[in-house]
């Protein structure tokens, strides 16, 4: 399958003062679904994230997500596996009408303090289409084979 570049949405961004010198968010491989986001922490004062704690880490950019899309902020698998670092409320959603700096809510689920340095790849963002549904209140749910079964009702 060939992806035609002219059909891809354009992601406009604004570099903030704390983002000066950082690489632009980028896809690290040809087939990558997410672009890596980097930490825009002070180069002289890395952020130490103790075990069991969380921190809001700036990226140094304002993103203009195209209308009809969202930015899904997700953990990086290597940080999660090697250090227990993950994103809370994952995936976090960056709405198309948000115009503030994108920040990443990181949590340390590991056993040791983790140091977040300037420019470190801390998360990935997937640009995905969204659908806004019409909401209609009804008086009874339609019948299905599953019914109200949940939480493992279809098997483990």
UniProtKB/Swiss-Prot annotation:
Pathway terms, separated by semicolons: Pyrimidine metabolism; dUMP biosynthesis; dUMP from dCTP (dUTP route): step 2/2
Reactions that this protein is recorded to catalyse: dUTP + H2O = dUMP + diphosphate + H(+)
Cofactor(s) the protein needs: Mg(2+)
Annotated Pfam families: dUTPase
First-level EC class: hydrolase
Signal peptide segment: none
Top-level lineage group: Bacteria
Alphabetized GO MF terms: dUTP diphosphatase activity; magnesium ion binding
BP terms from Gene Ontology: dUMP biosynthetic process; dUTP catabolic process
Family: Belongs to the dUTPase family.
PANTHER family: DEOXYURIDINE 5'-TRIPHOSPHATE NUCLEOTIDOHYDROLASE (PTHR11241:SF0)
Function recorded in the entry: This enzyme is involved in nucleotide metabolism: it produces dUMP, the immediate precursor of thymidine nucleotides and it decreases the intracellular concentration of dUTP so that uracil cannot be incorporated into DNA.
Protein name: Deoxyuridine 5'-triphosphate nucleotidohydrolase
Naturally occurring in which organism (per UniProt): Rhizobium etli (strain CIAT 652)
Lineage: Bacteria, Pseudomonadati, Pseudomonadota, Alphaproteobacteria, Hyphomicrobiales
Encoding gene per record: dut
């Amino acid at each position: 399958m060939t992806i035609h570049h002219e059909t891809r949405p354009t992601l406009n961004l604004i570099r903030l003062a704390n983002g000066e010198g950082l690489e632009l968010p980028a896809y690290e491989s040809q087939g990558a679904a997410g672009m890596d986001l980097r930490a825009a922490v002070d180069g002289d004062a890395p952020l130490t994230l103790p075990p069991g704690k969380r921190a809001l880490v700036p990226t140094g950019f304002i993103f203009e997500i195209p209308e009809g899309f969202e930015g899904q902020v997700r953990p990086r698998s290597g940080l999660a596996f090697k250090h227990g670092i993950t994103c809370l409320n994952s995936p976090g959603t960056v709405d198309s009408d948000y115009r503030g700096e994108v920040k990443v809510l990181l949590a340390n689920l590991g056993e040791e303090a983790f140091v977040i340095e300037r420019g470190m790849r801390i998360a990935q963002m997937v640009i995905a289409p969204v659908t806004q549904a019409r909401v209609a209140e009804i008086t009874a749910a339609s019948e299905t084979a599953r019914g109200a079964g949940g939480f493992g009702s279809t098997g483990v």
